[in-house]
């Protein structure tokens, strides 16, 4: 099953107009657009949060690795 063809889309549009009325369609489209916008915003915030957490983990591992290397060098010098 692929995309609906033009006659099928026209039938769907006609049914929507009959169910909701022509005046309600812009309101429905506005609500749908607002929902999509909020979803994209939440996805972006989540991606930024994950990136921040990953950066912190890398910094912690680097710090731990540097500390261990420094400690190992101190024990070999002694």
UniProtKB/Swiss-Prot annotation:
Residues 52-62 have a biased composition (Basic and acidic residues). Residues 46-78 are annotated as: Disordered. It is a single-pass membrane protein. One of its GO terms (molecular function) is protein transmembrane transporter activity. Its main location: membrane. GO terms for biological process: protein transport by the Tat complex. Keywords: Cell inner membrane, Cell membrane, Membrane, Protein transport, Translocation, Transmembrane, Transmembrane helix, Transport. The chain crosses the membrane at residues 1-21. The keyword Zinc does not apply. The keyword Membrane applies. Residues 63-78 have a biased composition (Low complexity). It is found in: Cell inner membrane. One of its GO terms (cellular component) is TAT protein transport complex. Belongs to the TatA/E family. Part of the twin-arginine translocation (Tat) system that transports large folded proteins containing a characteristic twin-arginine motif in their signal peptide across membranes. TatA could form the protein-conducting channel of the Tat system. NCBIfam families: tatAE (TIGR01411). PANTHER family: SEC-INDEPENDENT PROTEIN TRANSLOCASE PROTEIN TATA (PTHR42982:SF1). The Tat system comprises two distinct complexes: a TatABC complex, containing multiple copies of TatA, TatB and TatC subunits, and a separate TatA complex, containing only TatA subunits. Substrates initially bind to the TatABC complex, which probably triggers association of the separate TatA complex to form the active translocon. This is Sec-independent protein translocase protein TatA. The lineage of its organism: Bacteria, Pseudomonadati, Campylobacterota, Epsilonproteobacteria, Nautiliales.
